[in-house]
C-alpha cells in the first residue's frame, strides 16, 4: 500500500483553478475530479485511459465535518490508506481538477445524497484492488482495452469497502440519478438500467451526459476581449 501511495517523479501540474477560485462556485453534490500524482493514480489513469485518477464529492462547510487535523472539511473521498474520510478543499489546491455537477437535484434527493455520503465515513478502502493496481504501474502493462474497466471492478465487493468513484456512484444510485446507465428500447420507450456502482471510474463523471462541467473562469462573465496580452510576440515555453 505504501508503494502505491508514493508520488510519481516528473509530475507537473498545469492547474489554473485554485481552491479559492473554486469555493464561490462549487455546490453540494458536485463531483471534483483530480489528476493525481501518486503511483495508484498512474495505474487508474492507464486502466481508464483518462486524465482523471481520483474523485471526491463536495458536501460543503454546512455539513460540520472536520479533517483528521480538526480543520473544516468540505469534501468526502475514499483514500487508499485511510478509507472514507472528510478532507478540506484546499487539499487539492494546485492540482489539475474538473468540476462535474448533477443537475436539477431536488432538495430531498440532495439531502439523501449528503446523508448517504456522511454515513459512509469510516468505511475501509477496497485493498484487494491493490494486487491488480500494482501490476499496472509498470510501463506498457499487457491488458486489452476491453478488460481494463473490469480490472478496476475487481476486489472484495464487500459493502464496508469502497474506492473513490464507486463510493460516489453508490450514493447517486441511492437517489436514482444517472451517470452512465445502459439504455434499451422497449415498446418505443427508452428504459434506463443502472450499472453496478463497482464498474464506475472517475472519468465516467466527466463523460456523463447527465453532469454539467463547471469552469469557474467561464462562469464569472469571461470575455476574451478583456484579456491584456503580453507585448512580446514570442510564445512562452511553459
What are the functions of these language-model segments?
Residues 1-238:
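Cysteine-nucleophile amide-bond enzymes
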Amino acid at each position: 500500500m505504501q508503494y502505491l501511495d508514493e508520488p510519481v517523479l516528473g509530475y507537473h501540474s498545469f492547474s489554473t483553478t485554485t481552491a479559492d477560485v473554486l469555493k464561490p462556485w462549487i455546490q453540494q453534490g458536485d463531483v471534483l475530479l483530480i489528476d493525481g500524482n501518486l503511483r495508484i493514480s498512474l495505474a487508474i489513469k492507464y486502466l481508464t485511459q483518462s486524465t482523471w485518477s481520483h474523485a471526491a464529492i463536495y458536501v460543503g462547510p454546512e455539513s460540520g465535518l472536520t479533517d483528521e487535523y480538526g480543520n473544516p472539511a468540505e469534501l468526502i473521498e475514499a483514500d487508499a490508506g485511510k478509507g472514507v474520510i472528510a478532507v478540506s478543499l484546499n487539499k487539492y489546491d494546485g492540482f489539475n481538477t474538473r468540476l462535474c455537477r448533477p443537475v436539477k437535484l431536488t432538495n430531498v434527493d440532495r439531502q439523501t445524497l449528503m446523508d448517504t455520503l456522511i454515513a459512509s465515513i469510516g468505511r475501509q478502502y477496497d485493498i484487494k484492488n491493490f494486487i491488480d493496481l500494482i501490476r499496472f504501474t509498470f510501463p506498457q502493462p499487457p491488458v486489452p482495452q476491453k478488460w481494463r474497466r473490469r480490472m478496476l471492478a475487481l476486489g472484495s465487493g464487500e459493502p464496508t469497502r469502497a474506492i473513490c468513484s464507486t463510493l460516489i456512484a453508490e450514493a447517486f444510485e441511492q437517489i436514482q440519478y444517472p451517470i452512465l446507465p445502459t439504455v434499451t428500447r422497449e415498446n418505443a420507450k427508452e428504459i434506463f438500467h443502472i450499472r453496478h456502482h463497482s464498474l464506475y471510474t472517475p472519468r465516467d463523471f466527466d463523460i456523463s451526459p447527465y453532469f454539467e462541467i463547471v469552469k469557474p473562469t467561464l462562469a464569472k462573465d469571461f470575455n476574451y476581449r478583456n484579456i491584456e496580452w503580453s507585448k512580446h510576440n514570442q510564445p512562452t515555453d511553459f
